[in-house]
A protein has these predicted regions:
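Signal-peptide-cleaved, periplasmic/extracellular N-terminal interaction regions immediately downstream
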Residues: 1-157
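Active-site-adjacent mobile loop/cap segments within catalytic or ligand-binding domains
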Residues: 40, 53, 239, 290-390
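Short, solvent-exposed loop/turn elements at domain surfaces
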Residues: 41-43, 62-63, 167-171, 258, ...
Length: 390
């Protein structure tokens, strides 16, 4: 008889992050209150300089994502939250280079306090450590799995991509409403509508509050030979509360306007905000040729899908005054998979926010989007590559 399997260890509970300056010293202490000791790993990244602290098998109690933009010593700001299932992450943006000097666990009655002491470092020392950390990450990286070809006669696949998640909350509303929760809720409603119709298969890049990198989102859809990739987002422009309405984006090597360029720049920095390496600069030459040849048909189909979605939203909701836009979003760069990004509205606009927070408003929006996605996928098919994205 096989021995009983041990029960999974209960997650460590983290209760807040505190930055403590020491008077007369250039060092800084990071204090995290825990229910018990946890495995702690840390690394640094450059461009921009950041310190990343991972807590294994740990979840932050209370608010799922926390942070502050108030500068304290060498830290310009920080954020914390769930990074991967079973791992929480603290990311500190640095205004000068520092490294971890020591890590201690201090008992405080029934609880444990994690104390991480930082020390000043030169930029050369910091960059050298970042290079070592990067080599270690690459050595342990698991390659993407092979693509899974769609069997003959299979239903076309729609991949819904709720933006942000985990440590990355996305845009926020005036009372703490967060983009990551809104787009996940709308994605679930769209999936329900599509599954009820029964003519397409639906998968989601995330189904809970976890962080997924931009590249992983594209790989997820492309390796499953998706017929359409739909990334869902919401924006926020405080100080411009009159700006409202949904927009639909397709990939463009030149932004359609300044607002589109700003939106793409913000969304493309999601990985940096979560403590990942900044994306490498695009290679020139061959990639430019491949872009022109391989993407031409896909771009046309993406634009067709975008028009259909915009028309459907116009019938069921409120469009932005410039509803069809183009910009260089990283999640739209698959060369052989029609891809669109839908900004559902503005959390900084009272009318948009009300519609996105209420079940009736979400249902109405989801019904319109589902109808448009069905119309596109069932009536416009292109040959989808099964080559995995590298």
């Amino acid at each position: 008889m096989a021995p009983p399997r041990p029960a999974a260890a209960e997650s460590v509970q983290a209760r807040g992050v505190h930055l403590v300056e020491e008077p007369g010293s250039d060092t800084l202490g990071i204090v995290v209150d825990l229910s018990r000791e946890a495995t702690v790993r840390h690394e640094v990244l450059v461009e921009p300089n950041r310190l990343v602290i991972d807590l294994e098998n740990t979840v932050f109690a209370g608010a799922p994502a926390q942070g502050s933009n108030r500068a304290v010593g060498p830290v310009a700001g920080w954020r914390a939250g769930l990074f991967l299932l079973g791992r929480s992450r603290i990311v500190l943006d640095l205004n000068r280079p520092v490294l971890v000097q020591r890590t201690d666990f201090v008992r405080q009655g029934p609880h444990t306090r994690l104390v991480i002491q930082l020390r000043s470092a030169s930029q050369d020392e910091f960059a050298g450590r970042a290079q070592e950390d990067q080599k270690r990450r690459f050595a342990s990286r698991v390659p993407d799995g092979p693509s899974v070809p769609r069997p003959a006669g299979a239903k076309p696949l729609v991949v819904l991509d709720p933006g942000h998640g985990g440590i990355d909350p996305g845009a926020s509303g005036p009372k703490g409403e967060v983009e990551k929760e809104i787009v996940l809720a709308v994605a679930r409603l769209i999936r329900k509508q599509l599954e009820a119709d029964g003519r397409v298969e639906v998968q989601m890049t995330r189904e809970d509050d976890r962080f997924i990198s931009l590249g992983e989102r594209v790989v997820f859809a492309r390796n499953r030979s998706a017929a359409l990739f739909v990334s869902l987002h919401a924006d926020s422009l405080f100080g411009e509360a009159d700006v409202r309405g949904a927009s639909v984006y397709t990939l463009s090597d030149r932004a359609s306007d300044a607002a589109a360029a700003r939106a793409a720049e913000k969304e493309n920095r999601a990985d940096v905000a979560a403590g990942l390496d900044a994306p490498e600069a695009q290679r020139e030459g061959v990639d430019d040729i491949l872009f022109d040849l391989a993407r031409r048909e896909t771009r046309l189909f993406s634009q067709l899908a975008a028009r259909g979605v915009a028309q459907s939203i116009q019938r069921s909701g409120r469009l932005h005054k410039t509803p069809l836009r183009g910009a260089g979003f990283r999640v739209l760069r698959a060369p052989d998979m029609p891809s669109i990004l839908v900004e559902l509205g503005y959390l900084s606009n009272p009318e948009d926010l009300q519609a996105l927070m209420q079940e009736a408003g979400r249902q109405k929006l989801a019904q319109g989007l589902a109808a448009a996605l069905l119309d596109f996928v069932l009536n416009n098919r292109i040959a989808i590559s099964t080559k995995p994205l590298e």
